C-alpha cells in the first residue's frame, strides 16, 4: 500500500478547500430569482461576500494545515455541506433546504471548534470567524425563508 506523507495530504486538503470555495462562490446571487427576494436590511452588498469568503477559506486552510490529522474527516464532511449550500440556494432555489444545510454546517463546525480548542487554540481562533459567519448567513437564509 502506498503511504502518502501527512503533509501532502494536508496540502491537498488546503487546495481542495480553496477549489471548493472558489466553485461555490462562483455561483452567486445575480439571477432574477435572487434579486426578486425580500432580503434583510442586514444583507450586505454582493462584494462583501467576495471579500469575506476568500478570507474565511484562507483561515480554514491554515487551520486544516495545522490540525490535519485531528479534524480531517469532519472537515471533509463540512466542506461538502458548505459546497452544496450554494447550489441548493442559488441553483435550485431551495432556501428552506439550504437553511437545514447551514444549520447542519453550524453543528458540525461547532464540533470541530470544540476539538480544536482541546488540540490547538490558535487554530480554533482562526476557525471561529467561519462559525460566526455561518450564524450570520443562517440569519440571512432564515429571513429569506420567512419573508418569501
Feature roles, as predicted:
Residues 89-95, 111-125:
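Membrane-helix boundary connector in multi-pass membrane proteins
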Residues 17-23, 78-87, 131-138:
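Aromatic-anchored segments of alpha-helical transmembrane domains
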Amino acid at each position: 500500500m502506498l503511504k502518502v506523507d501527512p503533509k501532502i495530504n494536508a496540502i491537498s486538503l488546503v487546495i481542495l478547500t480553496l477549489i471548493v470555495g472558489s466553485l461555490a462562490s462562483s455561483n452567486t446571487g445575480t439571477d432574477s430569482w435572487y434579486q426578486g427576494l425580500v432580503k434583510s436590511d442586514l444583507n450586505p452588498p454582493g462584494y462583501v461576500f467576495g471579500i469575506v469568503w476568500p478570507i474565511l477559506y484562507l483561515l480554514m486552510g491554515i487551520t486544516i494545515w495545522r490540525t490535519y490529522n485531528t479534524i480531517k474527516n469532519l472537515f471533509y464532511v463540512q466542506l461538502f455541506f458548505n459546497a452544496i449550500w450554494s447550489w441548493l440556494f442559488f441553483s435550485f432555489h431551495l432556501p428552506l433546504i439550504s437553511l437545514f444545510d447551514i444549520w447542519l454546517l453550524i453543528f458540525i463546525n461547532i464540533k470541530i471548534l470544540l476539538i480544536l480548542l482541546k488540540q490547538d487554540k490558535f487554530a480554533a481562533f482562526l476557525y471561529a470567524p467561519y462559525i460566526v459567519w455561518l450564524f450570520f448567513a443562517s440569519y440571512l437564509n432564515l429571513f429569506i425563508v420567512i419573508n418569501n
